[in-house]
Regions:
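Flexible, surface-exposed loop regions and adjacent strand-edge segments
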Residues: 6-15, 129-139, 231-241
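Outer-membrane beta-barrel "beta-signal"
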Residues: 247-253
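Transmembrane beta-strands of outer-membrane beta-barrel pores
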Residues: 1-2, 107-109, 118-122, 194, ...
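Membrane-embedded beta-strand positions of outer-membrane beta-barrel proteins
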Residues: 114, 216-218
Length: 253
């Protein structure tokens, strides 16, 4: 926890750094996506014009439309700006808990060793390290499944709030790429770091063939991982927008 911080007195308490955790996130608070009911819509087709209804908070950028991210107006002034960011949202970017545990067992020369490692109490914001850009197709069962991932977005035909991506834009649109709780993810993980199974031949048996010791084994490293991000190796964090090369799965015999 930050006990003292040399900061200009803030207008609102949620902007205060003092009392927050180290490496915490300062984010806009997403309040779902804009819907057609938030606008007065005139015209047809490509000539449609959108005007926010009275009482509906404006976006972080001009020209918001249905499907863009809507943010909570924390200070109630009817607009979204830096005063609506909140300190210490989610968990810190650096894990507060790092752990490992394992098991070793042996019986009549046969043995097995297994080791897990993981982290907890940590969050990441997708795209935070790369100006809002990230590549969600590097990892897991959806690896390289660009088509299925891009389909998980808001469209007029699928005006769902339960999508990964808001309305698509042909260029970077600050309203939708700003660091916010829309992109906040639990970054905890548990990894099966390594497992080894083998057999130590008995000395009595080996003496018959002139060998002092012999062991055969199969070892695997970085075999699997359980996490909530599922787009890139969680142990590497959110650096480089997901383009960092994952830890290799290896086998040794």
């Amino acid at each position: 926890e930050i006990l003292e911080y040399d900061q200009v007195p803030q207008v609102y308490p949620w902007l205060e750094k003092k009392g927050t955790r180290l490496n915490s996130w300062k984010l806009y608070i997403a309040d779902g996506l804009y819907t057609a009911d938030d606008f007065n819509i005139t015209g047809e087709g490509l000539n449609r014009q959108y005007e926010l209804k009275s009482g509906v908070v404006s976006g972080l950028s001009s020209g918001v439309r249905p499907g863009d991210i809507k943010y909570k107006d924390l200070n109630g002034d009817g607009k979204i700006d830096s005063n609506d960011q909140m300190e210490d949202v989610g968990n810190p970017s650096v894990p507060e808990i790092v752990y490992g545990f394992g098991l070793n067992a042996e019986w009549k020369g046969a043995y097995v060793g297994i080791f897990f490692q993981g982290s907890g109490n940590t969050s990441t914001v997708l795209g935070a390290s790369s100006n809002g850009a990230f590549f969600p197709f590097q990892w897991g069962v959806e690896e390289s499944a660009v088509r299925s991932e891009v389909a998980n977005r808001w469209t007029e035909q699928n005006p769902s709030q339960n999508v990964m991506f808001p309305r698509m834009h042909s260029t970077n649109y600050d309203n939708n790429t700003a660091a916010s709780t829309w992109w906040l993810r639990n970054a905890r993980f548990l990894r099966l770091k390594n497992i080894e199974v083998g057999y130590n031949f008995k000395e009595k048996t080996l003496k018959k063939i002139g060998i002092q010791a012999l062991r055969v084994y199969l070892q695997g490293n970085n075999l699997c991982v359980w996490d909530d991000i599922k787009m890139w190796d969680p142990e590497l964090g959110n650096t480089n927008g997901g383009f960092s090369y994952p830890l290799s799965r290896t086998f040794t015999f």
